[in-house]
């Protein structure tokens, strides 16, 4: 039986009464948010709206994005990445558990020097994929061309954000490459590994 979203006490500054809010709303008020599922349009829009709102509210205080995600839709993930680059506050990314596929792309998009992985976190990069099994030939060709463009864009971002040569990133993206937290740090995807 699911327990639902826990409620926690919260008191607004200057108010005497405590109210009970769900834990995510409480954490949002502290500028902490979570990507703990597959990336899709819905979660992408929620994270984007949170980043923009909190950026408008106070543009000098960092935002913190905790990631434990198997990846998901490429375009939705790229929208999160682009928003992270657009908002004025630095977005610190913290990998806890897994940042795979487009989630690792979001992880590498955190502010340089402020990308962290927990000691037992795993990171996986690979090339974007699609399912062609029911496409007509013309659609197949157009989709393959779009995938190549997306791969070039993703590769370019990894090169820029990690400092690795393009041939290293391209070679790694040929297959699923899983990394420990320290390997991700050596690869330039994160800057720090949290101390145990």
Curated annotation (Swiss-Prot):
- Enzyme category, top tier: hydrolase
Q: Which reaction does it catalyse?
A: Hydrolysis of proteins to small peptides in the presence of ATP and magnesium. alpha-casein is the usual test substrate. In the absence of ATP, only oligopeptides shorter than five residues are hydrolyzed (such as succinyl-Leu-Tyr-|-NHMec, and Leu-Tyr-Leu-|-Tyr-Trp, in which cleavage of the -Tyr-|-Leu- and -Tyr-|-Trp bonds also occurs)
Q: Name one GO molecular function term.
A: ATPase binding
State the Gene3D superfamilies in the record.
Answer: 2-enoyl-CoA Hydratase, Chain A, domain 1
InterPro entries documented for this protein: ClpP, ClpP/crotonase-like_dom_sf, ClpP/TepA, ClpP_His_AS
Keyword Chloroplast on entry = yes
Biological process (GO), any one: protein quality control for misfolded or incompletely synthesized proteins
Task: Give EC number(s), comma-separated.
Answer: 3.4.21.92
Q: Where located?
A: Plastid, Chloroplast stroma
CDD domains attached to this UniProt entry: S14_ClpP_2
Among SUPFAM superfamilies, the record links this protein to: ClpP/crotonase
Does the UniProt entry include the keyword Transit peptide?
A: no
Q: Which UniProt keywords apply?
A: Chloroplast, Hydrolase, Plastid, Protease, Serine protease
Active-site residues per Swiss-Prot or TrEMBL entry? 101, 126
What cellular component GO annotations does this protein have?
chloroplast stroma; endopeptidase Clp complex
Which superkingdom, per the lineage? Answer: Eukaryota
Q: How does it assemble?
A: Component of the chloroplastic Clp protease core complex.
What is the stated purpose of this protein? Cleaves peptides in various proteins in a process that requires ATP hydrolysis. Has a chymotrypsin-like activity. Plays a major role in the degradation of misfolded proteins.
User: What family is reported?
Assistant: Belongs to the peptidase S14 family.
**Name of the molecule in the record:** ATP-dependent Clp protease proteolytic subunit
| Source species of the chain | Barbarea verna (Land cress)
At the highest ranks, the source species' classification is:
Eukaryota, Viridiplantae, Streptophyta, Embryophyta, Tracheophyta
